[in-house]
Amino acid sequence: MNADVFRSTCKQYMELRHINTREKLRAHTTIGSQHTFQKYWNDPDLIPMGVWEQIMDCLNVPTEDRLKMLK
């Protein structure tokens, strides 16, 4: 997964959903600590698939964009 594509897509949908900080995004997932979320944000390849799905569901990312991120 390309980290830049992941971050840019997340930021795009965060704006649409009025989630203006990564901390608010983290609150919608089961990620417990800020440190862990920061680690995942910097290297999306480390994100477990279940958590990745939670992030995408929270942001209402369409299937097409999800598939682009996984390529």
Where are these regions (language model features)?
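A short, Lys/Arg-rich alpha-helix, primarily the initiator
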Residues: 1-26
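Residue-level signal for the short linker/turn that defines the boundary of a DNA-recognition helix
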Residues: 19-21, 32, 50
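Residues in the recognition helix of alpha-helical DNA-binding motifs
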Residues: 13, 28, 39-40, 69-70
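Short, basic-rich loop-to-helix N-cap that marks the start of a DNA-contacting helix
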Residues: 43-57
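Recognition helix of helix-turn-helix/homeodomain-like DNA-binding domains
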Residues: 30-47
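Core residues of bacterial helix-turn-helix
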Residues: 29-30, 59
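The alpha-helix within a helix-turn-helix
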Residues: 26-27, 56
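Short C-terminal boundary/hinge segments that cap the last helix of small helical domains
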Residues: 60-71
